[in-house]
């Protein structure tokens, strides 16, 4: 048996099983993310939320997914059918593909590569193409204009996200996500984590993640309270479901990055409790709860306000933070407190 797993066939089978496990975990989480999102929103508005299908409404997401799947796929006249169907599939698969390098525990990662951060950015940057393709292939000017606005929004906030992560890379001296989590280790639990020295960037990263995922209050392209759905206006049935799934998976990816970069990943917040994958899941769900609460309580921004805050506030702040962290690391200024965080751990 050991010889089989060491052979190319065994390696291929191992990668296949790991890939299926990642897909099962993310898609299983997706079902309860949609349910939790609706329940939290309902609680803030003093409603019950989903409560009909299954106990406590737990099967409501399955019923909604089935409803989308059995509906007719209406293709607009003159649409590019190949690109029309490729766009939602591409959006979902790229978001799912990024989880290949996400470690849930020590050794619990499908591909423990040294450029994990770059891999995630490459995958997330390509998601813009799915949005553009979906708007263009619909053969309608309104979805196409919405896709351009959405692409501009996503690209704008990717710049800030990248600069924020550069600060973490300087502090840890690595782009390997497992190494970044290991750099959080220490005798003081959560006080050793990078949220403390990089606290302003935690706030900027969270808000930028909202804009990157088209989540409220930055859901200007496909606001749920409006009559149209932005670049997805001409989509229905399963393709529309794939677009929705891609957005939730991308949001879950941002929750994972927040947990790994700033909050110790699978490390325990207190030294006397064992580390484990459950801490990673708890932290991801905490950040998802924060995403849902923002959706429920924060009013929507105008598009000009969204772009202004991205380019005139977040970009200068994140760039200035990179310069500050680089200076502290290079000259070992403020040794003691910053020596632990700004000189490669």
Swiss-Prot record:
Give the InterPro entries listed for this entry: NADH_UbQ_OxRdtase_su1/FPO, NADH_UbQ_OxRdtase_su1_CS
Q: Name one GO molecular function term.
A: oxidoreductase activity, acting on NAD(P)H, quinone or similar compound as acceptor
List the subcellular locations: Cell inner membrane
Membrane-spanning segments: 15-35, 82-102, 115-135, 161-181, 190-210, 240-262, 278-298, 309-329
Q: Does the keyword NAD apply?
A: yes
Top-rank taxon of the source lineage equals Bacteria
Q: Keywords, A to Z?
A: Cell inner membrane, Cell membrane, Membrane, NAD, Quinone, Translocase, Transmembrane, Transmembrane helix, Ubiquinone
Q: From the UniProt record, list the reaction(s) this protein catalyses.
A: a quinone + NADH + 5 H(+)(in) = a quinol + NAD(+) + 4 H(+)(out)
Might you give the EC number(s) for this enzyme? 7.1.1.-
A single GO CC term for this protein reads: plasma membrane
**Membrane topology label:** Multi-pass membrane protein
Q: What GO biological process terms does the UniProt entry carry, in alphabetical order?
A: aerobic respiration
State the similarity comment. Belongs to the complex I subunit 1 family.
- Could you tell me which NCBIfam families the record lists for this protein? PRK06076.1-2, PRK06076.1-6
Quaternary assembly: NDH-1 is composed of at least 14 different subunits, Nqo1 to Nqo14. The complex has a L-shaped structure, with the hydrophobic arm (subunits Nqo7, Nqo8, Nqo10 to Nqo14) embedded in the inner membrane and the hydrophilic peripheral arm (subunits Nqo1 to Nqo6, Nqo9) protruding into the bacterial cytoplasm. The hydrophilic domain contains all the redox centers.
This molecule's function is given as:
NDH-1 shuttles electrons from NADH, via FMN and iron-sulfur (Fe-S) centers, to quinones in the respiratory chain. The immediate electron acceptor for the enzyme in this species is believed to be ubiquinone. Couples the redox reaction to proton translocation (for every two electrons transferred, four hydrogen ions are translocated across the cytoplasmic membrane), and thus conserves the redox energy in a proton gradient.
* Name used for this protein in its record: NADH-quinone oxidoreductase subunit 8
Task: List the source organism.
Answer: Paracoccus denitrificans
